[in-house]
Regions:
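Hydrophobic (often cysteine-bearing) scaffold residues that line and stabilize catalytic clefts
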Residues: 17, 49, 99
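Glycine- and acidic
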Residues: 1-8, 37-39, 83-90, 134
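FabD-like malonyl-/acyl-CoA
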Residues: 12-24, 52, 56
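Alpha-helical scaffold segments in soluble metabolic enzymes
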Residues: 20, 52, 75, 102-106
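Generic beta-strand/beta-sheet core signal
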Residues: 6-9, 15-19, 38-41, 65-70, ...
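Active-site adenylate/phosphate-handling loop in enzymes that bind or generate adenylated species
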Residues: 25, 60, 84-134
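A conserved beta-strand->alpha-helix junction
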Residues: 30, 34-88, 96, 122
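RNA-binding accessory domains that recognize and position tRNA/RNA substrates
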Residues: 1-5, 23-33
């Protein structure tokens, strides 16, 4: 696979991440379409941030993937007994962790490298996908 995967929410952190990735792709003489911008709407996604993410990916020439994580997060809440009405740290971080999981799975199947600027988790993940050896 010859791609870079970036989670794109339409917010500041992911905007900077895809802009940096775009510059890196140009420096490596790679086509913009080798950037896979993954937007993962859920409960807190606004129309504005969703539209910002889509427009930015299109303007940069990235390949855009939309993966709705709402059903997965709702199932997780059901599993752990989290109320949809309780907008606490668990509510927010469950969405962030699901996005990280989705991005890592997309990256390991499609990318040479990936970047998950997930500020809700308090640390960024970056690096090449890993593979297990037997």
């Amino acid at each position: 696979a010859q791609a870079a995967v970036v989670g794109l929410s339409g917010g500041l952190d992911s905007t900077l991440a895809i802009l940096i990735t775009s510059v890196a792709m140009r420096l490596m003489d790679r086509p913009a379409s080798d950037m896979i911008a993954v937007t993962m709407p859920c409960f807190g996604t606004t129309e504005r941030t969703r539209d910002n993410a889509v427009e930015l990916a299109e303007r940069l020439g990235a390949t855009l993937r939309r993966i709705d994580i709402g059903a997965a997060v709702r199932q997780h809440f059901k599993d752990i007994g989290q109320s949809m009405d309780d907008h606490d740290v668990t509510f927010e971080n469950s969405q962030a962790r699901e996005r990280t999981q989705v991005l890592m799975d997309v990256a390991t199947s499609a990318a040479d490298w990936w970047w998950v600027p997930e500020t809700s988790l308090s640390w960024p993940w970056a690096g090449p996908p890993t593979t297990a050896t037997t």
